[in-house]
């Protein structure tokens, strides 16, 4: 039978193989295989006993059945560990054991169980694991010896490489030594020393000569008189360059100051501006007559306070401060501010002839186009233009009283409060006519 390609877990693990543990793990498999073999033998015994034929054939079948019963009893008495150990130790051949005339029932039972495919698969896997473990133990000292040999060879290679590197450097040293030997003569040494000194002096003088025109404040010792004369009478070009540099520095100093002042003014104007659209709309809708009196009253909140503070500041303090350079951003902000003020001043003047209930209808087209007061387009107007005026049932006295009720100006209220007040007034006027009896003349 072919061995199982997948070895057990113990084989895969690197720890040393413990055979006793593997034998103990095999107990369950051995018991299961023993039950299967006993069932098969019982069926074969019953088949042999049921066969019919001549007397010789019947006797032969009885002897076979007797031997199988002996094997069954031997299997029941055997322990699983004995079966696994015997299967691992020897290569058992069932046919050879059965042909032996002196073979016992236990031997035949062990051979029969060891030959079973399931147990044979497990046993072959264990044998392979044991063999691998033995090979690993045998190869371990060989591997250690090979490692030590490789380390020694590496250690030997390092000094060799160092020696080769030193040898490669030695020829240069020899050449330098020969040159030194040649230069030992006093005349040649003096000449070489004088030549080197001259070269050094020239090298030192070169950078000084180059540096003198750039740094007139540090003249050399040789040309001190010439440099002093040049310093005493500087050229006009240098003067102009110095003035230009001073101007550029002054401009660069002044520019950040102007920028900082303009930024501060812009930030102050942005802080001072406070536009609460809800308050503005409420103030316009509730008190149109008051708006017509004072042009700047539509500003609510912080704008009034800031304007009062600016008016309170004396003009002398403003004259003392120099006017800073205003940037283009501040100019644009001021123009926007003035345009907005002019627009808002024109709105209350145009609203002098407004009706009490419908501001948007009585005002001009420009006021109707104001997005804050423009009604949504999908809603139908309260009073269509083409319809005739509704015939009022009120008497002349009631109309006069209603008109007189319109005249007194109330204090500015919230729009919801004004609507509730008007609704109550209308209900009180209508309640007068509900209790009257209608009489008809004959």
UniProtKB/Swiss-Prot annotation:
Places the protein is found: Cytoplasm, Perinuclear region
Alphabetically ordered keywords of this record: Coiled coil, Cytoplasm, Isopeptide bond, Phosphoprotein, Transcription, Transcription regulation, Ubl conjugation
List of residues that carry Phosphoserine: 215, 277, 292, 294, 362
UniProt feature, compositional bias: Polar residues: 237-247
Protein's UniProt keywords contain Hydrolase: no
Pfam families from the UniProt entry: BUD22 (PF09073)
Biased composition annotated in UniProt, kind: Acidic residues: 266-278
Superkingdom classification of source: Eukaryota
Coiled coil (residue ranges): 55-77, 118-140
Placement of covalent cross-link Glycyl lysine isopeptide (Lys-Gly) (interchain with G-Cter in SUMO2): 202, 329
Keyword Ubl conjugation (UniProt): yes
Main localization of the protein described in the UniProt heading: cytoplasm
GO terms for biological process, alphabetical: maturation of SSU-rRNA
Region (Disordered) residue spans: 137-336, 358-442
Compositionally skewed regions (Basic and acidic residues) per UniProt: 149-159, 167-188, 367-382
CC annotations in GO: 90S preribosome; nucleus; perinuclear region of cytoplasm
Protein role: May be involved in regulating transcriptional activation of cardiac genes during the aging process. May play a role in biosynthesis and/or processing of SLC2A4 in adipose cells.
PANTHER family: SERUM RESPONSE FACTOR-BINDING, SERUM RESPONSE FACTOR-BINDING PROTEIN 1
Subunit structure: Interacts with SRF. Forms complexes with SRF and SRF cofactors ARID2, MYOCD and NKX2-5. Interacts with the N-terminus of SLC2A4.
Protein name: Serum response factor-binding protein 1
């Amino acid at each position: 039978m072919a061995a199982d390609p997948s070895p057990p877990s113990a084989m895969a693990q690197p720890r040393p193989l413990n055979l006793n543990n593997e034998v103990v793990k095999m107990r369950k498999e051995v018991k299961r295989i023993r039950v299967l073999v006993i069932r098969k033998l019982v069926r074969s015994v019953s088949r042999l006993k049921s066969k019919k034929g001549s007397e010789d054939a019947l006797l032969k079948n009885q002897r076979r059945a007797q031997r199988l019963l002996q094997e069954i009893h031997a299997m029941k008495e055997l322990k699983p560990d004995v079966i696994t150990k015997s299967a691992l130790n020897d290569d058992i051949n069932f046919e050879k054991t059965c042909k032996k005339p002196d073979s016992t029932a236990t031997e035949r039972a062990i051979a029969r169980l060891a030959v079973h495919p399931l147990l044979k698969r497990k046993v072959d896997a264990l044998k392979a694991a044991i063999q691998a473990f033995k090979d690993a133990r045998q190869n371990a000292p060989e591997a250690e010896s090979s490692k030590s040999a490789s380390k020694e060879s590496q250690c030997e290679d390092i000094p060799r490489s160092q020696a080769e590197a030193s040898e490669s450097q030695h020829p240069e040293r020899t050449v330098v030594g020969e040159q030194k030997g040649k230069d030992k003569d006093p005349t040649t040494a003096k000449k070489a020393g004088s030549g080197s000194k001259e070269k050094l002096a020239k090298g030192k003088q070169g950078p000084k000569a180059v540096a003198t025109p750039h740094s007139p404040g540090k003249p050399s010792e040789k040309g001190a008189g010439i440099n002093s004369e040049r310093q005493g009478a500087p050229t006009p070009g240098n003067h102009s360059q110095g003035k230009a540099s001073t101007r550029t520095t002054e401009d660069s100093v002044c520019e950040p100051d102007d920028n900082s002042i303009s930024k501060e003014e812009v930030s102050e104007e942005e802080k001072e501006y406070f536009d609460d659209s809800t308050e503005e709309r409420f103030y316009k809708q509730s008190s149109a007559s008051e708006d017509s009196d004072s042009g700047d009253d539509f500003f609510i909140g912080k704008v009034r306070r800031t304007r009062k503070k600016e008016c309170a500041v004396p003009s002398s303090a403003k004259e003392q401060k120099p006017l800073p350079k205003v940037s283009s951003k501040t100019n644009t902000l001021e123009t926007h501010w003035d345009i907005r003020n002019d627009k808002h001043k024109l709105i209350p003047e145009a609203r002098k002839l407004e009706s009490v209930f419908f501001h948007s209808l009585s005002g001009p087209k420009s006021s109707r186009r104001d997005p804050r007061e423009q009604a949504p387009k999908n809603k139908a107007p309260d009073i269509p233009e083409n319809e005739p005026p509704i015939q009022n049932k009120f008497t002349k006295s009631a109309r006069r009283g209603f008109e007189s009720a319109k005249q007194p100006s109330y204090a500015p209220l919230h729009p919801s409060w004004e609507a509730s007040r008007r609704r109550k007034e209308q209900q009180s006027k209508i309640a007068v006519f509900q209790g009257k009896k209608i009489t008809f003349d004959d």
